[in-house]
């Protein structure tokens, strides 16, 4: 007897239930549990969550459920900031709609494909359109795509959409849609620059922040290394070369820093690939192909640009700087140690990073404190040993502390023996109290 799927609670159409069974889904993820009921009812929602939380099915399942196959008009528009992400969403939708008895038309429109062919195909409008903001906007301007009939707009990876300069395109798309539009925005972070756009189109949206689960992977070793007064790029280069990675990805927080690091490593004789929002789609696609072919051993990337790209065989992840949003640490380091292989996640840190390292430790990350000496990693003592020693002192009995001080002073014969006897007597009393 098969287990009853917990997706039944949402009341999806039977063909969606069949698709869910075929996909092997049983238990909804946290984001699905929280947001699917509201999306089915037509609520506008901002969902702050990382990739890998089941986010895509959170919006595609209710959208497919609510589509009217009898109506040859656009009913939902889904934007994603990269061709890879848009294609992934389209493929996931097709895995569900193929079980529908009545055909649900879904069309993918992305840059780098034949625009005229897309226009010809749009002579019959699809019920669901998925694509990159630039290409969707182009087709609206060409009057080939009509979105005024759509009830729902999804902006997936909104922070990346902003970072890659697509927000104006999304603004134009939203402006052509009905006033009572259901807008679903998904983003790992909510940057300040995104907020005016959200307030323009969303009145009192529901907001949900789904915290990532820290999977304490036994295959990933989390290391931290203080840069101290050393040249950070020299140190990084020495570590990368000395570690002999199968494939190493170095993460930075900004495009500017990614350029500086990549150029600095190239100047130091390394062959380095670079992935960030200012790299044009064609070059990005070529770079990805070269990485897959192992033409590069070292990749420098920003969090936003690396999102949605599945790079196989990463043996080392290096945090050139700790991310401001610690959710990204989980996402970065989760790229290594996959499929049973071991992985190393190394963070180069400064004194100013101590608070964030402490927060990560509270989240369940166990760090190994290392340094780079004589072309190899050496293990150091716990960086918090002094603080732990101080804390231990503070919890000691004040009388015992006083006795210790006296024991260090010079005194009469057998003086230290008497002091030690008294200290042991104090400890015995304390132990009796705790019984």
UniProtKB/Swiss-Prot annotation:
A motif (Q motif) lies at residues 5-33. The gene is cshB. GO terms for molecular function: ATP binding; ATP hydrolysis activity; RNA helicase activity; RNA strand annealing activity. Residues 391-403 have a biased composition (Basic and acidic residues). Keywords: ATP-binding, Cytoplasm, Helicase, Hydrolase, Nucleotide-binding, RNA-binding, Stress response. Disruption phenotype: Growth rate decreased at 37 and 25 degrees Celsius, almost completely stopped at 3 degrees Celsius. No motility at 25 or 3 degrees Celsius. Decreased growth at 42 degrees Celsius, pH 9.4 and in the presence of 5 mM H(2)O(2). Its EC number is 3.6.4.13. Residues 36-208 form the Helicase ATP-binding domain. It holds the Pfam family Helicase_C. Residues 235-378 form the Helicase C-terminal domain. CDD domains: DEADc, SF2_C_DEAD. It is found in: Cytoplasm. InterPro entries: CshB, DEAD/DEAH_box_helicase_dom, DEAD_box_RNA_helicases, Helicase_ATP-bd, Helicase_C-like, P-loop_NTPase, RNA_helicase_DEAD_Q_motif. It comes from Listeria monocytogenes serovar 1/2a (strain ATCC BAA-679 / EGD-e). GO terms for biological process: response to cold; RNA catabolic process. Gene3D superfamilies: P-loop containing nucleotide triphosphate hydrolases (3.40.50.300). Residues 383-435 are annotated as: Disordered. It comes from the Bacteria. PANTHER family: DEAD-BOX ATP-DEPENDENT RNA HELICASE 47, MITOCHONDRIAL (PTHR47963), DEAD-BOX ATP-DEPENDENT RNA HELICASE CSHB (PTHR47963:SF1). It catalyses: ATP + H2O = ADP + phosphate + H(+). This is DEAD-box ATP-dependent RNA helicase CshB. It is an enzyme of class 3 (hydrolase). Residues 404-420 have a biased composition (Basic residues). The keyword RNA-binding applies. Induction: By growth at 3 degrees Celsius, and 3.5% ethanol.
């Amino acid at each position: 007897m098969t287990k009853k799927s917990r997706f039944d609670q949402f009341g999806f159409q039977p063909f969606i239930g069949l698709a869910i069974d075929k996909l092997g889904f049983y238990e909804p993820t946290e984001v699905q549990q929280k947001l699917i009921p509201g999306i089915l009812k037509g609520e506008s929602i901002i969902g702050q969550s990382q990739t890998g939380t089941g986010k895509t099915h959170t919006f595609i399942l209710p959208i497919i459920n609510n589509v009217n196959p009898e109506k040859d008009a656009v009913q939902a528009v889904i934007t994603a900031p990269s061709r890879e992400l848009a294609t992934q969403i389209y493929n996931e939708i097709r895995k569900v709609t193929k079980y529908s008895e009545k055909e649900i038309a879904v069309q993918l429109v992305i840059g780098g494909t034949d625009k005229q062919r897309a226009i010809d195909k749009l002579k019959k409008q699809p019920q669901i359109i998925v694509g990159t903001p630039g290409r969707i906007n182009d087709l609206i301007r060409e009057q080939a795509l009509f979105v005024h009939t759509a009830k729902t707009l999804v902006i997936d990876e909104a922070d990346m959409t902003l970072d890659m300069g697509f927000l104006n395109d999304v603004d134009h798309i939203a402006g052509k849609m009905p006033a009572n539009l259901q807008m679903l925005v998904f983003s790992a972070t909510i940057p300040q620059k995104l907020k005016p756009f959200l307030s323009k189109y969303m009145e009192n949206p529901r907001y949900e922040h789904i915290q990532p689960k820290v999977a304490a992977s036994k295959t990933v070793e989390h290391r931290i290394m203080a840069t101290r007064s050393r040249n950070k790029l020299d140190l990084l280069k020495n570590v990368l070369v000395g570690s002999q990675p199968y494939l190493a990805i170095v993460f930075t927080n900004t495009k500017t820093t990614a350029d500086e690091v990549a150029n600095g490593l190239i100047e130091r004789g390394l062959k380095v690939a670079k992935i960030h929002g200012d790299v044009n789609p064609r070059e990005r696609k070529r770079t990805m192909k070269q990485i897959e072919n192992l033409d590069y051993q070292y990749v420098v990337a920003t969090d936003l640009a690396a999102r949605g790209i599945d790079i196989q065989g990463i043996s080392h992840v290096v945090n050139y700087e700790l991310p401001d949003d610690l959710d990204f640490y989980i996402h970065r380091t989760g790229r290594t140690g996959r499929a049973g292989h071991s992985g190393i996640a190394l963070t180069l840190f400064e004194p100013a990073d101590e608070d964030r390292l402490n927060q990560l430790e509270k989240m369940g990350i166990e760090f190994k404190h290392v340094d780079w000496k004589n072309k190899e990693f050496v293990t150091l003592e716990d960086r918090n040993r002094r603080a732990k020693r101080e804390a231990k002192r503070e919890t000691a009995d004040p009388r015992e502390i006083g006795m210790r001080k006296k024991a260090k002073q010079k005194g009469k014969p057998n003086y230290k023996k008497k002091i030690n006897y008294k200290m042991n007597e104090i400890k015995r009393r304390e132990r009796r109290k705790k019984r």
